[in-house]
C-alpha cells in the first residue's frame, strides 16, 4: 500500500511550485476542469500564475447534461472571470457514455444523446458538432474521450502539452502512483 512521504513543504506551496514548473516547461497547457472543488482550486492557482507570467492556457470542460444548475453557473462564472488568460475554453456537449448509478434497467447513459429528450439545452457556444474533434466517435466513453482529447490537443499545438487535472491525493493513496 502506498504511503505519503512528507517533504517539508505544505500542499499549497508544492502546488504553486509544480504549476510554475508546468508553465516554465510547456508552451501549451490545458486544465481538465469539472466544476468541482478540486479543479476549481487548480483553476484559481493556474490563473494566478498565468497572469503573473503573462501566459494563457486552455480549459476542457465536459458538460454531462444532467448537472446541477449551480455547477453550470459556477463554470460559466469562472470562464468569464478568467477569459483574459484562457486560450480556448472547450465546453464539450457531445454524446458520451457513462455509468448510470441510478438505474438497474439502464446501467449506462449517453448524455446529449441524439433523438433523446435532454434535461436542458447546452450553451450556444458549446461544442455540439461531432466533427469538431477528428477523434470523436458517437457515444464514446469519457475514459476513451479524455486520452484522445489529450493526444489531439498536443498535436494541434504542434508540441508536447501539459494537461492538468485537480485531484486531491488524500482522496485515494493510489493517486500517488
Residue ranges and their predicted role:
Residues 1-177:
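ATP-dependent adenylation/nucleotidyltransferase module used to activate substrates
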Amino acid at each position: 500500500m502506498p504511503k505519503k512521504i512528507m517533504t517539508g513543504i505544505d500542499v499549497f506551496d508544492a502546488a504553486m511550485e509544480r504549476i510554475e514548473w508546468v508553465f516554465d516547461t510547456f508552451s501549451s497547457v490545458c486544465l481538465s476542469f469539472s466544476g468541482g472543488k478540486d479543479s476549481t482550486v487548480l483553476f484559481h492557482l493556474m490563473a494566478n500564475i498565468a497572469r503573473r507570467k503573462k501566459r494563457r492556457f486552455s480549459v476542457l470542460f465536459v458538460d454531462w447534461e444532467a448537472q446541477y444548475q449551480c455547477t453550470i453557473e459556477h463554470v460559466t462564472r469562472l470562464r468569464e472571470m478568467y477569459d483574459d488568460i484562457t486560450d480556448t475554453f472547450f465546453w464539450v456537449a457531445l454524446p458520451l457514455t457513462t455509468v448510470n448509478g441510478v438505474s438497474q434497467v439502464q446501467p449506462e447513459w449517453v448524455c446529449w444523446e441524439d433523438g433523446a429528450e435532454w434535461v436542458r439545452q447546452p450553451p450556444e457556444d458549446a461544442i455540439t458538432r461531432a466533427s469538431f474533434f477528428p477523434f470523436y466517435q458517437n457515444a464514446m466513453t469519457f475514459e476513451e474521450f479524455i486520452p484522445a482529447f489529450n493526444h489531439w490537443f498536443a498535436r494541434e499545438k504542434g508540441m508536447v502539452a501539459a494537461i492538468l487535472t485537480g485531484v486531491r491525493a488524500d482522496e485515494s493513496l493510489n493517486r500517488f502512483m
